[in-house]
Amino acid sequence: MLVLVLGDLHIPHRCNSLPAKFKKLLVPGKIQHILCTGNLCTKESYDYLKTLAGDVHIVRGDFDESLNYPEQKVVTVGQFKIGLIHGHQVIPWGDMASLALLQRQFDVDILISGHTHKFEAFEHENKFYINPGSATGAYNALETNIIPSFVLMDIQASTVVTYVYQLIGDDVKVERIEYKKS
């Protein structure tokens, strides 16, 4: 089961669109679920995601125009409970102790957060944490040189194989990280 994880698009305020090389990779009919950390910013970005998969879950980012998105969400995909937040609630941004507290409060196997615009994926105390980064490479308050990235999770039974796609220069680099539920 393929799950696309992305966020912080900031279209059209900071970027015009997803990189063309990412659009070529993201084709309709291949992905079953989309988990978005927010800051889509427009209905058009949401409509684009709906063309890729029927099951789209979005949480509200600090720049989203739509107030209909929830602040947080817990989604079950296969054997995994996945928590989804934008990440501006985590202080300081990306703080491990704050993320671990949210993971315990949500009682999830995987916690997905964004906001920092920097990709991260790691295991901590037998739980898995993912920050997909910014799919467009939009700048943030602290940095302008952001590497565009998104994540595809391949969920099979009690294993998640995470593929991170990063646009470095003109090349899409892919890294593989595996997490087994204990």
UniProtKB/Swiss-Prot annotation:
- Please name the SUPFAM superfamilies in this protein's record: Metallo-dependent phosphatases (SSF56300)
User: Keywords of this protein's UniProt record, alphabetized?
Assistant: Acetylation, Cytoplasm, Endosome, Membrane, Metal-binding, Protein transport, Transport, Zinc
Kindly give the membrane topology term recorded for this protein.
Peripheral membrane protein
Please provide, alphabetically and separated by semicolons, the GO molecular function terms listed in this UniProt record.
Answer: metal ion binding
In which compartments does the protein localize? Cytoplasm; Membrane; Endosome membrane; Early endosome
Cystine pairs annotated here are none
Q: Any one Gene Ontology biological process term?
A: retrograde transport, endosome to Golgi
Q: What is its main location?
A: cytoplasm
Where in the sequence is N6-acetyllysine found?
A: K50
A Gene Ontology term for the protein's cellular component = early endosome
Cross-referenced Pfam families? Metallophos_2
Give the matching InterPro entries: Calcineurin-like_PHP_lpxH, Metallo-depent_PP-like, Phosphodiesterase_MJ0936/Vps29, Vps29
Assembly, in brief, is: Component of the commander complex consisting of the CCC subcomplex and the retriever subcomplex. Component of the heterotrimeric retriever complex formed by VPS26C, VPS29 and VPS35L; within the complex interacts with VPS35L. Component of the heterotrimeric retromer cargo-selective complex (CSC), also described as vacuolar protein sorting subcomplex (VPS), formed by VPS26 (VPS26A or VPS26B), VPS29 and VPS35. The CSC has a highly elongated structure with VPS26 and VPS29 binding independently at opposite distal ends of VPS35 as central platform.
Name the family the entry cites: Belongs to the VPS29 family.
Query: Which purpose does this protein serve, as stated in its record?
Result: Component of the commander complex that is essential for endosomal recycling of transmembrane cargos; the commander complex is composed of the CCC subcomplex and the retriever subcomplex. Component of the retriever complex, which is a heterotrimeric complex related to retromer cargo-selective complex (CSC) and essential for retromer-independent retrieval and recycling of numerous cargos such as integrin alpha-5/beta-1 (ITGA5:ITGB1). Component of the retromer cargo-selective complex (CSC).
Which protein is depicted? Answer: Vacuolar protein sorting-associated protein 29
UniProt source species: Rattus norvegicus
Q: What is the lineage of its organism?
A: Eukaryota, Metazoa, Chordata, Craniata, Vertebrata
From the UniProt record, report the name of the gene that encodes this protein. Answer: Vps29
